[in-house]
Curated annotation (Swiss-Prot):
It comes from the Bacteria. This is Fructose-1,6-bisphosphatase class 1. The lineage of its organism: Bacteria, Pseudomonadati, Pseudomonadota, Alphaproteobacteria, Hyphomicrobiales. It comes from Nitrobacter vulgaris. Its EC number is 3.1.3.11. Pathway: Carbohydrate biosynthesis; gluconeogenesis. It catalyses: beta-D-fructose 1,6-bisphosphate + H2O = beta-D-fructose 6-phosphate + phosphate. The keyword Magnesium applies.
C-alpha cells in the first residue's frame, strides 16, 4: 500500500472502462469533494456561522440543525449534474428523481450525529449507491446486498473516508494541504471477537430480554460466561462508533425498544444498509438480532430496523440469544442477574 495513493487513483484502477463502475467512480469522487467542503465547515464551526441551533425537524422527526441543512445542499450540488437516476436524503421526505435512464441511485445521510456539533464531537456523512431498477421509484426498495458501493466520512480530529465497492474496505484520510483523500488503510478486517460494546445503557429498562441478557453477560466480565472483562463505549455518533469497530473490533447495538418512536431503531436506507455492507466487507456481522440487515428490503425510504453490528462472534452470540429464547432466559436468571451492574 502506498501512502500517496489518492482516492481518485484508487477509483480509476477499480472502474476501468465499465460504464456502471465509471458512474460509481464519479459519484464517489463527487461525494469526496463534498466531504472536503463539509469538513471545512465543521472545522471552522462558529467562525463559519455554524451554531448547532435547531432549524426544525426533518421527515424522520429528528431535530434538524443548521449544518444538517448546509451539508445536505453541498452534497446535492455535488451530485446534481452526474449520471444519477435518483437521490434520497435523510433530510427529505421523498425521492428526488433526476435522470431515470442513468445507471445508479444515491442515498445519503448528510450529517450523522449532528446533536454532537455544539459539544465539538465527531459527526459524519453516510452514503449508499444502488443500481437503478426498472422502476426508478423503487430505487431503494432493494435488498442491501444489491449495493454497488457504500461509505462514510468521519469529521473528527482527522477527516477519514471509509469505502467499500463490494471487494473489501479501504480507509482514506484527508490531506488538508492537497485537499484530497489518500489511502491509509487497505483491506481492513474487523477482529472476529473483541471485548468492547457500545450501547446507550440509560435505556436498559426499555430493551427486550435478549439485549438485556447479552449486556449483563458482558458486564459480568471474567466472572460470567464470557470469561473476560468488557469495556463500554458510547459516543452517540454512528460513524464514530463504526470507525472504532473497524479499527479495534467490538459490537455496536442500537436495538428497537419499548419507548414511543424508538420501537424500530436505525434508518435502513441511510444508515443500516450502508453500515452493514461496510461491516460485512470487513469480515464482521450486521443483524437486527433476528435477520441479516443486508437481506432486508425496505418498503419505504424512512423505514427503521434494529441495528447490531461488529465483530462476527459477538454479533452471532446476540443473534443466538434472540433465536433461542432459553439462552436469554438462562442468562437473565437471578443467580447470574445479581452480577449485572444494571440489575434493578
Amino acid at each position: 500500500m502506498s501512502q500517496e495513493l489518492t482516492l481518485q487513483q484508487r477509483m480509476d484502477g477499480e472502474a476501468g472502462s465499465d460504464p456502471l463502475r465509471q458512474a460509481v467512480k464519479e459519484a464517489v469522487a463527487a461525494l469526496a469533494r463534498a466531504a472536503v467542503d463539509i469538513s471545512d465547515l465543521t472545522c471552522r464551526g462558529a467562525l463559519a456561522g455554524i451554531t448547532g441551533q435547531a432549524q426544525g425537524r426533518n421527515t424522520d422527526g429528528d431535530i434538524q440543525k443548521d449544518l444538517d441543512v448546509r451539508a445536505d445542499q453541498i452534497i446535492r450540488d455535488a451530485l446534481g449534474k452526474l449520471p444519477i437516476a435518483a437521490l434520497a436524503s435523510e433530510e427529505m421526505a421523498d425521492l428526488d428523481i433526476l435522470n431515470p435512464a442513468a445507471p445508479i441511485c444515491v442515498a445519503f445521510d448528510p450529517l450523522d450525529g449532528s446533536s454532537n456539533i455544539n459539544t465539538n464531537m465527531s459527526v459524519g456523512t453516510i452514503f449508499s449507491i444502488m443500481p437503478t431498477p426498472s422502476d426508478v421509484n423503487a430505487a431503494f426498495r432493494q435488498a442491501g446486498s444489491a449495493q454497488l458501493a457504500a461509505g462514510f466520512v468521519v469529521y473528527g480530529p482527522q477527516t477519514s473516508l471509509v469505502l467499500t465497492l463490494g471487494r473489501g474496505v479501504d480507509i482514506f484520510t484527508l490531506d488538508r494541504a492537497d485537499r484530497v483523500f489518500k489511502l491509509t488503510g487497505s483491506s481492513v478486517q474487523i477482529p472476529t471477537d473483541a471485548n468492547e460494546f457500545a450501547i446507550n445503557a440509560s435505556n436498559r429498562r426499555h430493551w427486550d430480554l435478549p439485549v438485556r441478557a447479552y449486556i449483563d453477560e458482558c458486564l459480568a466480565g471474567a466472572d460470567g460466561p464470557c470469561g473476560k472483562n468488557f469495556n463500554m463505549r458510547w459516543i452517540g455518533s454512528l460513524v464514530a462508533e463504526a470507525f472504532r469497530i473497524l479499527i479495534r473490533g467490538g459490537i455496536f447495538l442500537y436495538p428497537g425498544d419499548a419507548r414511543d418512536g424508538y420501537e424500530e431503531g436505525r434508518l435502513v436506507v441511510y444508515e443500516a444498509h450502508p453500515m452493514a455492507f461496510i461491516v460485512e466487507q470487513a469480515g464482521g456481522g450486521a443483524s437486527t438480532g433476528r435477520k441479516r440487515v443486508l437481506d432486508i428490503v425496505p418498503d419505504s425510504l424512512h423505514q427503521r430496523v434494529p441495528l447490531i453490528m461488529g465483530s462476527i462472534k459477538n454479533v452471532q452470540r446476540l443473534e443466538h440469544m434472540h433465536t433461542v429464547p432459553d439462552v436469554a432466559l438462562e442468562a437473565n436468571a437471578p443467580l447470574f442477574g445479581n452480577r449485572g451492574l444494571f440489575r434493578v
